């Protein structure tokens, strides 16, 4: 009887050691890295009283990052995105419905997002973090229409706006946190809402002037992937985003009119809206 008891104790110890080894192995499988190559379509609108503009720009986009395991309650993610080689689009300006100006428009952006994940239950997570964004809006090839003359931005001018933003973000995510599920198919997604805590925009037309603005943004994204081999998935990524910028406070500026006269006046950032569709092929791995 004592021998059987010893065997049971030894078996329990061995089983415990095996379980610990399995737990350690499982922990090594948590988290993953990813790389996305795709295209981004941006629809941008500016809204002045009685005056509005719109443009739609397409550009290639790279998105890379990963999800990193901390413990049973927390993970964190880092995402870095950049667009490049934008396809120039025509921006149209209308006053009370009448076309008054067109110009070529290019849009580029780069962003880095860091989020802490709190695991609620199963695959559901609460997100909180921050992000840094940099956007450029380039305009050139201005043409006036229907007798309108732009007194600030003249035909033949090229001008560029550069915006730097720091956002506080919060949201909700659905993610298993690993690539080793029972099914070969895997679904993940997240929704994030953010407000800027620091936002500065400069326009090359007005030297040494900075515009401070406020607004909000939100986006929803999802990935559907299939396991090619253990630890490697290929899939498709889709993200829909919306950003709102409110009109900024006016700044005192100096400029040269279309007729060559030096003048002073006020300038401000108009209310603006940006819709974004980002989609592409995504690879995820953990080896």
What are these regions (language model features)?
Residues 21-92, 269-287:
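Short glycine/proline- and aromatic-enriched beta-strand/turn motifs that initiate or cap beta-hairpins
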Residues 22-31, 68-77, 116-126, 177-187, ...:
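Short loop/turn motifs that connect adjacent beta-strands in outer-membrane beta-barrel proteins
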Residues 31, 54-62, 84, 104-112, ...:
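Residues that define the transmembrane beta-barrel architecture of outer-membrane proteins
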Residues 39, 62-68, 82, 112-118, ...:
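Residues on the lipid-exposed face of transmembrane beta-strands in outer-membrane beta-barrel proteins
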Residues 41-53, 88-98, 137-149, 197-209, ...:
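Outer-membrane beta-barrel translocator domains and adjoining extracellular loop/strand segments
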Residues 85-173:
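Outer-membrane pore/translocation modules
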Residues 151-214:
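Short helix-loop boundary/capping segments
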Residues 211-287:
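Predominantly the C-terminal beta-signal and adjacent terminal strand-loop region
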């Amino acid at each position: 009887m004592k021998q059987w008891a010893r065997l049971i104790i030894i078996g329990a110890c061995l089983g415990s050691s095996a379980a610990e080894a399995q737990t350690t192995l499982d922990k090594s499988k948590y988290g993953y890295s990813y790389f996305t190559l795709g295209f981004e379509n941006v629809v941008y609108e500016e809204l002045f009283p009685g005056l509005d503009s719109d443009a739609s720009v397409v550009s290639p986009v790279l998105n890379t990052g990963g999800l990193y395991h901390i413990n049973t309650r927390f993970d964190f993610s880092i995402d870095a995105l950049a667009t490049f080689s934008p396809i120039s689009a025509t921006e149209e300006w209308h006053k009370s419905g009448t076309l008054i100006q067109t110009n070529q428009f290019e849009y580029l952006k780069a962003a880095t997002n860091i989020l802490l994940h709190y695991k609620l239950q199963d695959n559901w997570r609460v997100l909180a973090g921050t992000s840094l964004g940099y956007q450029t809006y380039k305009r050139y090839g201005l043409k006036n229409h229907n007798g309108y003359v732009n007194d600030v931005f003249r035909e033949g001018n090229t001008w560029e706006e550069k915006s730097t933003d720091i956002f506080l973000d919060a949201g909700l995510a659905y993610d298993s946190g690993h690539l080793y599920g029972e099914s070969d198919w895997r679904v993940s997604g997240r929704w994030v809402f953010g407000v800027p805590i620091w936002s500065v925009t400069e326009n090359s037309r007005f030297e040494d002037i900075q515009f401070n603005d406020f607004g909000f943004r939100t986006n929803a994204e999802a990935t559907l992937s299939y396991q090619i081999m253990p630890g490697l998935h290929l899939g498709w990524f889709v993200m829909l985003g919306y950003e709102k910028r409110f009109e900024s406070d006016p700044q005192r500026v100096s400029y040269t009119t279309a007729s060559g006269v030096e003048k002073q006046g006020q300038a401000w950032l108009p209310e603006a809206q940006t819709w974004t569709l980002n989609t592409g092929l995504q690879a995820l791995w953990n080896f």
